[in-house]
Structures are given as C-alpha cells and as structure tokens.
Amino acid sequence: MHFLIPAAGSGSRMKAGKNKLLIDLEGESLIYWTLKSVFSASSTNWVGIIGQPKDKNLLLNSAKDFAHKVHWINGGDTRQQSVFNGLKALPKDAEKVLIHDGARCLINPELIDLCAKQLDENEAVILATKVTDTIKIVDNEGFIKETPDRNHLWAAQTPQGFLVDRLIKAHKMAIDKNWTVTDDASLFEILNWKVKIVEGAYSNIKITSPIDLKIAKLFVKDP
C-alpha cells in the first residue's frame, strides 16, 4: 500500500513556533510516532511525506531510524494542493493510496491495514467514529436552527483511502472548477462518488492543541 502523509502543520494553535509535527512527545517528534505506526502496518510498502522545504531535513531526520525509506515531496500552499503534489509523486504502478494526517500520531496499525483491505472492495474509504455528542446547527447569529439525528453523524478521521486514478481525476476536476475542500473524501462527495465508512477509534485524535498533546502523552505511556 502506498501511503502519503501531509506534514505541513504550522503549530500556531500549539504556540510552538515551528511545524507541530516536530513537537516533542515522550522524547520523539510527533511525526516519529506517526511513522512508527505506519511502518508497523503490514500493508505499508511505500511512504511519502509531503511538507514545506524548510522542514525537510528535520522531518526526514525523524525517519532515519526506520528500516524503510521515506520519500520527500514538496507541498503546496494548501493541504489540497499538497495532496495533489503527493499523488503526482507516487510511483507509476501505484493503484491504491492511503492519505493520513501527520498529526494523528496515535493511529493503530491494525486500522491502517483494515482501510487497506477495504480498498479491495471500495474505490474510497475513510476512518470515522460515531458522534456521541448532541450536535446543533446554528444560524449566522448563533441561534439554534435544528438538531440532526446523531445516528447518521460520523466524525471523519484519517487515513482516507482511494483508488489512485479516481482521486487524481477528482483533484483535476477540483482545479478546473475551483473547488476547495478540507479532506479528499469531500471531493468524492461533490462528485456523488461513493465513500465507505470504516469505524475508527476515539484514540485516533489529531494533535491541534496543548490539551491534545497531554492526551497523547497518556496513550504513549500506556498504550
């Protein structure tokens, strides 16, 4: 399985003053823990990190202790552009790809393998968890408009997996039509292409705040 890791997080909400994937977590960088999980998945055979040139040496240094090679891909101005750069850098024989946020450093390798397996039967899959909170939809003035049935609500995670040719086609259409999305599955939604939900884990959090980092430390100490 080919694996792409967008890794251009600024760390502004972490007040880190650097790429948040370089923040220390129990003696190693966040990207180290992400790579450890990725390489622990039996389905992984090719990994590319997509990031900004200024972070290249530090990010790749976090990968030096792994037996597998990590390929570097220069990112774009947005996550969407960065992923498209990553897709263009895949080997020509790549048929399937998993895309995973570098800041989700607690991903279980078994979930990675599960997503890879689901791509045998689906052209697009994403990890997600059932929403347990009551969600409110509000108007522009902050007043509640409605409460959707949470039985139909899932919180999207990564990895998200796709057939490479289909995802490249979706990205090219997004460029032509000037679509902007926050994840790749959204492109498939716009095109009315099916995306299969694979139930993930609540521990697969995205590190975006100091609170998240404290939670991650607990999981790393006691997995």
UniProtKB/Swiss-Prot annotation:
A single GO molecular function term of this UniProt record: 2-C-methyl-D-erythritol 4-phosphate cytidylyltransferase activity
A GO biological-process term: isopentenyl diphosphate biosynthetic process, methylerythritol 4-phosphate pathway
Chain positions of site Positions MEP for the nucleophilic attack: R150, K206
Site (Transition state stabilizer): R13, K20
Pathway: Isoprenoid biosynthesis; isopentenyl diphosphate biosynthesis via DXP pathway; isopentenyl diphosphate from 1-deoxy-D-xylulose 5-phosphate: step 2/6
Keywords: Isoprene biosynthesis, Nucleotidyltransferase, Transferase
Domain of life: Bacteria
Reactions that this protein is recorded to catalyse: 2-C-methyl-D-erythritol 4-phosphate + CTP + H(+) = 4-CDP-2-C-methyl-D-erythritol + diphosphate
Enzyme Commission code(s) on record: 2.7.7.60
InterPro entries, A to Z: IspD, IspD/TarI, IspD/TarI_cytidylyltransf_bact, ISPD_synthase_CS, Nucleotide-diphossugar_trans
Signal peptide: none
Function: Catalyzes the formation of 4-diphosphocytidyl-2-C-methyl-D-erythritol from CTP and 2-C-methyl-D-erythritol 4-phosphate (MEP).
Recorded family membership: Belongs to the IspD/TarI cytidylyltransferase family. IspD subfamily.
Protein name (record): 2-C-methyl-D-erythritol 4-phosphate cytidylyltransferase
Organism: Prochlorococcus marinus (strain MIT 9215)
